[in-house]
UniProtKB/Swiss-Prot annotation:
It is found in: Cytoplasm. Coiled coil: none annotated. Pathway: Membrane lipid metabolism; glycerophospholipid metabolism. One of its GO terms (biological process) is glycerol-3-phosphate biosynthetic process. GO terms for molecular function: glycerol-3-phosphate dehydrogenase [NAD(P)+] activity; NAD binding. This is Glycerol-3-phosphate dehydrogenase [NAD(P)+]. NADPH binds at residues 11-12, 32-33, 106, 140, 255, 280, 282. The active site is at residue 191. Pfam families: NAD_Gly3P_dh_C, NAD_Gly3P_dh_N.
Length: 332
């Protein structure tokens, strides 16, 4: 049993709180809003972000980050990618010296295109062997409902990955370890962008052929980019690559897919965000960073380019699909 601090009470942070508690650990859950922490503590529910799920008694909720972080062996970051640097900068003095930090958000820093593990290292001063990434086909509601799922815990230090793995293994949640942090992070980021494209196609009532094409060619550009950044190509055929991509592109529970559908139906970014209960899909924040990384490494990412054109350049989904189909023919 270890002491776990989960920093962020959104749907995924709350779900992983339940997983760590069900694995036999004591867990403190930090919520940014006082009322969310109070509701969890008094009712064992988080109706705003994870309705209908009972939060175990082993969980203590608080809105005080110092209280949440005190004596934690594992610190799980559940804040959105755009908030990671500022949050860790504020919490740096409270972080226990020996704690492992586990990253949940699947995004890139908007201005720098840095991966979350890189941002965490810079903001916390921790070495890479103390920073892990959790990534895989993990839709929060399904995991919270204890439907069988698997994931990947990636860290450059296998022993650290093993510690996190042991702390979050339950009868319904099976983590595997990996030392390819770059591959697991790029797989998690890119699939959000590809899922936006899949949602856009679904919003146009396009069928399975189109969906399969987007997933397959999306995987191809993810492998190209990841390999250029130093990832192991084999990672992308595993849970943190293909597994996550398939789940996120196909499920109606996927925020990125749903967001893409809204955009395809003519909504603006602001309207789509409102339709998604005020939450922006990570793929919207990541698509330009993916494009920037790809250009810096001379990698072709046509689907990501198409998503950028719809989200930020005023292109319609139909125009973007036509542009993709009219590209020069080539070998697969």
């Amino acid at each position: 049993m270890v002491a776990v601090a989960v920093m962020g009470a959104g749907s995924w942070g709350t779900t992983m709180t339940k997983v760590f508690a069900d694995a036999g650990n004591t867990v403190r859950l930090w919520a940014r809003r006082d009322e969310v922490a109070d509701e969890i503590q008094s009712t064992r529910r988080n109706q705003c972000y994870l309705p209908g799920v009972v939060i175990p008694d082993a969980v203590t909720a608080t809105s005080d980050p110092r209280v949440a972080l005190t004596d934690a062996d594992i610190v799980v970051l559940g804040v959105p990618s755009h908030a990671v640097r500022d949050s860790l900068t504020r919490w740096r003095d409270f972080l226990p010296d020996d704690a492992l930090i586990v990253s949940l958000p699947k995004g890139l820093e908007r201005d720098t295109a840095r991966r979350m593990s890189e941002v965490i290292a810079e903001a916390s001063g921790r070495p890479s062997e103390k920073i892990a990434v959790l990534s895989g086909p993990n839709l929060a509601k399904e995991v919270a409902d204890e439907q069988p799922a698997a994931t990947v815990v990636a860290c450059t230090d296998h022993d650290s990955a093993k510690r996190v793995q042991e702390a979050c293994t339950t009868a319904y949640f099976r983590p595997y370890t990996n030392t390819d942090v770059i591959g697991c992070e790029i797989g998690g980021v890119a699939k959000n962008v590809i899922a936006l494209a899949a949602g856009m196609a679904a919003g146009q009532n396009l069928g399975f052929n189109t969906a399969a094409t987007i997933i397959t060619r999306g995987l191809a550009e993810t492998v190209r980019l990841g390999t250029a950044l130093g990832a192991n190509p084999a990672t992308f055929s595993g849970l943190a690559g293909l597994g996550d991509l398939v789940a996120t592109c196909n499920s109606p529970l996927s925020r990125n897919r749903t967001f893409g559908e809204h955009l395809s139906q003519g909504m603006s970014l602001e309207e789509a965000q409102e339709a998604c209960h005020g939450q922006v899909a990570e793929g919207v924040n990541a698509c330009r960073a993916i494009q920037s990384l790809a250009r810096a490494h001379s990698v072709d990412v046509p689907i990501a380019d198409a998503v950028v054109s719809v989200c930020f350049d005023g292109a319609t989904v139909k125009e973007s699909i036509m542009n993709l189909m009219e590209r020069d023919t080539k070998a697969e």
